[in-house]
Amino acid sequence: FGLMITMEEGDQSTDPRGIGNFASGVPLGESGLSSRRAPYSTDFSINDYTYGDSNNTAQITQPHGVGFVFATMLWDLTWAYVDKYGFDSDLFNGNGGNNKVMQLVLDGLKLQPCSPGFIDGRDAILAADMASTGGQNQCLIWEVFANRGLGYNASQGDSGDRTDQVEDYNLPPEEDPSLENCEVLSLENILNLASVYPNPSNGFVSISSEYINGQTTVQLID
């Protein structure tokens, strides 16, 4: 949540973000290794930690080390939402991907059981999306978690056991009914579908697209 509420316009998903940098004397706004094993980043050359690493008791301590691995996944999820819905600097009233994912994670916390494991946390977030959108982001959420080893066939074993996690990179089968309402278009995809010009408008606008043939209906909302 600390990373989410300190995001700024222009930040990139691959930027290295540290936690508690001040404790190491790192100036505000600059990245450092901080108090985690690696900075948070979607770039695997910066942060390549996956679910299986949570078994490594020599390097991944508890509670912060284990939480770091799950937070790495949530940071990837944050940027997946920003890619799809855009960024909104208004934390309280905004409707960007950063706003949506923060609410999603909060809703997931309300749904997960006591003493949760990684699978419990993942499934609670999926359930929160199903409850709030009917499952529009199920595919996106699965792709993010599977990319870090928390895939469809992953196992958390006993949530109280540090070394029985099994990672997996598979997605649910396409015929899984929970995926039927998936929306897979990102903001970039949408922008590539059509262009509206001129901007600013002189009272008239033109809409151009290479992907729409024949008649269609367009609704413009200001």
Locations of the language-model features?
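C-terminal outer-membrane/trafficking sorting elements
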Residues: 188-222
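Extracellular protease catalytic domains of secreted zymogens
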Residues: 1-182
